[in-house]
Amino acid sequence: MTLTQEFDTIAAISTPLGEGAIAIVRLSGTDALKIAQSVYKGKNLTQVASHTINYGHIFEEKRLVDEVMVSVMRAPKTFTREDIVEINTHGGIAVTQEILQLLLRNGARLAEPGEFTKRAFLNGRIDLAQAESVMDLIRAKTDKAANIAVKQLDGSLSKMINNIRQEILESLAQVEVNIDYPEYDDVETMTSQMLLEKTAHFEQLLENLLSTAKRGKILREGLKTAIIGRPNVGKSSLLNQLLREEKAIVTDIAGTTRDVITEFANIGGVPLELVDTAGIRETDDLVEAIGVERSKKALAEADLVLLVLDASNELTDKDLELLELSKNSNRIVLLNKTDLPEKIDSTQISGDFIRISALKNENLNAVEEKINQIFFAGEIEAKDATVLSNARHISIVEEALKALKEANSGLALGLPVDLIQVDVTRCWQLLGEITGEAAPDELITQLFSQFCLGK
């Protein structure tokens, strides 16, 4: 995107394309009001008060296109800090596309993906971490993932990072003064021991932040969960209960699920990417055999394994094989079909297990509790905590920590403070990439290109 494009007027459809009650076509830029007025009949939009909604009609010359409500928001109190117009039309592909084309013909440019949010960032309305949280909020699959995104949009992570960077900067400034003006007696000398204490403090702050990454990443991206078991033990029934809808075929015929079915479920605020695998068994059916191989691959890649056993039958060699195959995984063993007389010998199962009836939806809440225990130590969400959830942020904090550890190692070896300053400065610069203070232009462009059109 060139510099001249940054401040022209852009337009895009901000709601998903398709049939619906309402769609929104958004304009942002210096000429937003003038361009909207050129296709609108009603009150003069260039003269109405800011943050008002106005009733009128969109015309192509003399032909009526739609009856609309138009929101007018004047700079700088807008999302982009530019003039913004939002045209609320009747939902539908044809009418929204026609209105968008009218705006483009009258001087607007089609916005690039994420360009509205990018302008908010470039105009100082939000920082880079807050911009990324906008997309996290849009993509959140559970209320807890949304809560993390909202807190970051409100600036919780940015404030923490900025505070740490400020502390680091003050230490660096003191070192710099000592180096450049050694004759100054009124400035305290930063000794190796003093700097070691400070870098150890910074290291602890980042360690504490990084300790939230596992929980945050799971809540943001979900747990890849493989449902495995012999054919006809109730895997598809379990999938349907967890999804609260029928996605998999449930029959008494072994081998009904011949492929891998993937769906997302919200289990106590944790997004589970549920993979209902084909029953793992020996088979001559080529299609089913491919499904079995995919099942084994899903097991190897899973964050969580739900191993389903048929409690109404004795354990088979295949059951024992699956127990052995999954023993080193984050595994929950489920004894299904407890609505039938129990025949399974549970003493042959090492570790914990949960008795359930997928058919009757009995005791599935125990599965939720076990997931919480395995991945969150019983506390899925710490109130008011700043949580790292974005993979880019996690990687940066890890690199910043590495720089601090190198600084501490150098201090322990007796290296002079001015040499250690290089590693501490690198830590400060890396943390600036989270908020965008030190992010290269290429990174910023790449990040916003991942946004949806119209946001």
UniProtKB/Swiss-Prot annotation:
Q: How is the cofactor bound?
A: Binds 1 potassium ion per subunit.
Point out the signal peptide segment: none
> Which residues of the sequence carry a binding annotation for Mg(2+)?
236, 257
The EC number(s) attached to this protein equal: 3.6.-.-
Of which family is this protein a member? Belongs to the TRAFAC class TrmE-Era-EngA-EngB-Septin-like GTPase superfamily. TrmE GTPase family.
Q: What does this protein do?
A: Exhibits a very high intrinsic GTPase hydrolysis rate. Involved in the addition of a carboxymethylaminomethyl (cmnm) group at the wobble position (U34) of certain tRNAs, forming tRNA-cmnm(5)s(2)U34.
The record ties this protein, via NCBIfam families, to: mnmE_trmE_thdF, PRK05291.1-3, small_GTP
Q: Quaternary structure?
A: Homodimer. Heterotetramer of two MnmE and two MnmG subunits.
Keyword Lipid metabolism carried by entry: no
Listed binding positions for GTP are 232-237, 251-257, 276-279
Identify the residues that bind K(+): 232, 251, 253, 256
Q: What GO biological process terms does the UniProt entry carry, in alphabetical order? A: tRNA methylation; tRNA wobble uridine modification
Write out the GO cellular component annotations: cytosol
The entry's protein name is tRNA modification GTPase MnmE
Q: Which residues form the TrmE-type G domain?
A: 222-376
Entry GO MF terms: GTP binding; GTPase activity; metal ion binding
Cofactor(s), by name: K(+)
What PROSITE patterns does this protein's entry cite? G_TRME
> What residues bind (6S)-5-formyl-5,6,7,8-tetrahydrofolate, as annotated?
26, 86, 125, 455
InterPro entries in UniProt: G_TrmE, GTP-bd, GTP-bd_TrmE_N, GTPase_MnmE, MnmE_dom2, MnmE_helical, P-loop_NTPase, Small_GTP-bd
Any matching Pfam family:
MnmE_helical
Key word Nucleotide-binding present in the record? Answer: yes
Q: Which UniProt keywords apply?
A: Cytoplasm, GTP-binding, Hydrolase, Magnesium, Metal-binding, Nucleotide-binding, Potassium, tRNA processing
